Amino acid sequence: MGQKPIVVFPSDYFSSKTVDGEYMPERNAALGTGLFDCALFSYRKWEEQGILSLNFSGNTSGEEMSVPAIYRGWMMSPEKYCKFYMSLLQKGIRLITAPQEYKLAHYFPDAYPYLKADTAKITIYPLHSKINVEEIKKTFGRFMVKDYVKSVKGTKFPAFFDENTTQKQFDEAMKLFYSYRGDILSGGICVKQHFILKKYGQHSNEWRVFYAKGIPCEAMPNSEQPENAARPPQNLTEKYKNLPSPYYCLDYAELETGQWGILESGDGGVSGLPHGQDIPAYYRFLHKFLFANKV
């Protein structure tokens, strides 16, 4: 039997030999399947010094005979992920997601051309640029603001803006947005059409689907909705199984109209597993479709 594929996890910030607690259930599950080896990298050294210090007891043979791997961990900018990818490759570990594939799924505007038939319309702006709210209102009746990766929902920043929003109100709100995102701002500003979501009590009906080389994993509820909530249509989740990345996820939501739309895209390695996900089954799924070369 050949070398097992590797799952690369971040370490605890203060202990490079201990997996970050958030990912301990995943590491245990991955090892428990018997299908993967696991490697840790010092998250502190990586964040503070940009140095990849790897804790891995297995064998690698250098760049030419590199062992395939996936990353499961915290988000990185595309630039930092590229450095991470190359640093691992020099150590004989080849992440299955190349830097350009990571960026495509991680930055929503990059994924947008592949999703636009079933997602919110967007307009993008450079960070800290002046945004003319009157121009936006000509395109969108109701809209929200995020950077290329994240919104600041759950804060004092408005969940959406509409035709009554003045330029002054918008400018003041954007100051708040920048203060919340701080030094983790990503890419640029993305103004999105605001979807009105169907509610089941207090909860929307959102589902996350991971994809591995064109095969969708089981859709999992992702917004604490009740068990009787509708599931996303299979023809919709199948429609988006061929984005140009081997490992990504999409978030689907039921709209107030009863239709369905795509809320977000994400790189598979930095997207969290929904509560209730069968983690060992998830890792068996990844092994079968990412590494076993069979369907």
Q: What positions do the PLM features span?
A:
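ATP-binding N-terminal substructure of ATP-dependent carboxylate-amine bond-forming enzymes
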Residues: 1-94, 291
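Active-site nucleotide/adenylate-binding loops and adjacent lid/helix of ATP-dependent enzymes
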Residues: 2, 7-17, 63, 85-205, ...
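Short amphipathic alpha-helical segments and helix-helix/interface helices
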Residues: 26-30, 81-86, 112, 133, ...
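Short, surface-exposed coil-to-beta transition loops
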Residues: 79, 83, 202-207, 247-248
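Protein kinase-like catalytic core scaffold
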Residues: 143, 217, 248, 261-264
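A short glycine-rich, hydrophobically flanked beta-strand micro-motif that places a catalytic Asp/Glu
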Residues: 189-193, 245-256
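Short acidic-glycine loop/turn motifs at beta-strand connectors
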Residues: 211-215, 256-258
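C-terminal active-site "lid" helix and adjoining low-complexity regulatory extension at the edge
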Residues: 241-245, 254-295
